[in-house]
């Protein structure tokens, strides 16, 4: 018997955030694709260089490593993401991993600072 789309959607709806991250990574590997949103290329206007010179407004905070203070980094990740202990631990152990995506510059820098104060290393993308 084939699995229906509704069954798949129901199973996905019941997954935790970390399970979804693992599912996406497995699908990327299996099918050789990325989960990045497709962006349509717009024709360049007369001031095309001006758009390239605009400052980035959204940042992704990526945990590079947790160093030798894993417990402190897990606490910092829980504080900034609101994840449960298990999910935060899985996120930290899967480094490099995104902690926060689409954050403002100030928010991203604050999250990076908290992770680094806890003993981990993070970068902004």
Curated annotation (Swiss-Prot):
Disulfide-linked positions: none
SUPFAM superfamilies for the chain: ClpS-like (SSF54736), Ribosomal protein L7/12, oligomerisation (N-terminal) domain (SSF48300)
InterPro entries: Ribosomal_bL12 (IPR000206), Ribosomal_bL12_C (IPR013823), Ribosomal_bL12_C/ClpS-like (IPR014719), Ribosomal_bL12_oligo (IPR008932), Ribosomal_bL12_oligo_N_sf (IPR036235)
A family per Pfam: Ribosomal_L12
GO CC terms: cytosolic large ribosomal subunit
Family as reported in the entry's similarity comment: Belongs to the bacterial ribosomal protein bL12 family.
PANTHER family in the record: 39S RIBOSOMAL PROTEIN L12, LARGE RIBOSOMAL SUBUNIT PROTEIN BL12M
Stated name of the protein: Large ribosomal subunit protein bL12
Gene that specifies this protein: rplL
């Amino acid at each position: 018997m084939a699995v229906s789309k509704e069954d798949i959607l129901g199973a996905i709806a019941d997954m935790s955030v970390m399970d979804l991250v693992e599912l996406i990574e497995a699908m990327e590997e299996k099918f050789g694709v990325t989960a990045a949103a497709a962006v349509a290329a717009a024709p360049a206007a007369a001031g095309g260089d001006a758009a390239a010179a605009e400052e980035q407004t959204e940042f992704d905070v990526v945990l590079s490593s947790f160093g030798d203070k894993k417990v402190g980094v897990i606490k910092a990740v829980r504080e900034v993401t609101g994840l449960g202990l298990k999910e935060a631990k899985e996120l930290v152990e899967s480094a490099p991993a995104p902690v926060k995506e689409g954050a403002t510059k100030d928010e991203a820098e604050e999250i990076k600072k908290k992770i680094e104060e806890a003993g981990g290393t993070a970068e902004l993308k």
